[in-house]
Amino acid sequence: GATVAVHFINHTIATAAQLKQMLHISNDNYFEWRFGNIYYTKKGTGSPILLIHDTLPGASGYEWSKIEDELAIDHTVYTVDLLGCGRSDKSSITYTNFVYVQMISDFIKKIIGQKTDVIASGFSGSFVTMACHNEKELFNKIMLVNPPSLTQLKQMPNRKDRLLKAALEIPIFGTLVYHMIVSRDNINNLFIEKMYYNPFHVDNQMADAYYEAAHKGGYYTIFLYSSLAAKYININICHALKALDNSIYIVEGETEPNGKAVTDDYCASNPAIEVSVLKETKHLPHVEAPEAFLEQVKIFF
C-alpha cells in the first residue's frame, strides 16, 4: 500500500512540475545517439558556437536563453541538452565524464560538421577539456564559465558513494528522495544561495524551467543525479588541461565560492589561460549579467 501511495505522489509531483511547459520542443531537433536522443536547437548564421549547460539538477539548454539570440547575429549557435537533462533522453546508465566527452565529440562531428568554438558552464567545462584533449581537431576557442575545482574533480567514488548511488536508484523510494531534493523550494533556494549574486534578481521563468527539467522523464531523472552525487562524473583533468594549446578563456563570477582559487589552479596548470571576472555575478553570469557576459564573448571569439 505504501509503495502504491508513494508511486502516486511521485507521479503527481512529476506531472505538476511540467504544467507551465517552459521547455519548448520541436521534434526535428533530435540527434540520435547511441545512449539516447539528444535535444538541441540551432539558430543564426556564421561561425559555429556550441553552448553546453551545467549539470546541476534541472539544468538544460534553457540556461543560455538570455544570450543565444544575440550570439546568433554573428554565429550559428548550437545549444544542447546534455544526455540525462532537459528534453534529452534520461537514460538508465551510470553517467561518467567519458559518456559526455563522447557525446560532445559525436555531436560536433555529426551535427555541426566542422571545428567549433565552445562555451561550457560549470561542471561541463571538465567534459570539454577532456574532449578537446582527445580530439583537438574538433575544437577552436573554448570559454569556461565558473569551471569546477581541479581538486574536486580528483575525488573518486568510494564504498559509501557506491552505496548512496544504489540507494538513490531504488525505484519509487529513490524517486521520492529525489523529488524532495528538487522540490520547488529547493530549486528556489539553489538560485538564491548558489546561482545569483543578487537574490532579488532571480528570474522566476528560469527557476520554472529548472523545476520542469528536473522532473521530465519520471523515475529515470534519478540516474544523472545519483552519478553526480556519487562522484562518478569526476575525472582528473590536470594532464589534459596542461596539454591543451587552444585559446582558453575563463569567465568567473565575482562571488563564486573559491572562484579565485579555482581559476588560479587552472592558470597554474596552463599559463596561457586568460581570466575575466564579472562583477556582481555568481554562478550564472550569463543569466544575471547577459550584456556584460556578451561583451566578454565578443572580445574573445
Walk through the language-model features, giving the residues of each:
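Alpha/beta-hydrolase fold catalytic core
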Residues: 1-49, 73-75, 301
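Conserved HGGG/HGGXW glycine-rich cap/lid loop of the alpha/beta-hydrolase fold
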Residues: 41-87
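Active-site loop/oxyanion-hole signature of alpha/beta-hydrolase fold enzymes
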Residues: 79-119, 295
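Short glycine-enriched nucleophile-adjacent loop
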Residues: 125-136, 142
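Flexible "cap/lid" loop of the alpha/beta hydrolase fold
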Residues: 133, 141-175
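Conserved alpha/beta-hydrolase catalytic His-Asp/Glu region
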Residues: 154, 179-240
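Conserved loop-alpha-helix segment in the C-terminal half of the alpha/beta-hydrolase fold
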Residues: 243-281
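Catalytic active-site module of serine/aspartate enzymes centered on a nucleophile-bearing elbow/loop
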Residues: 271-301
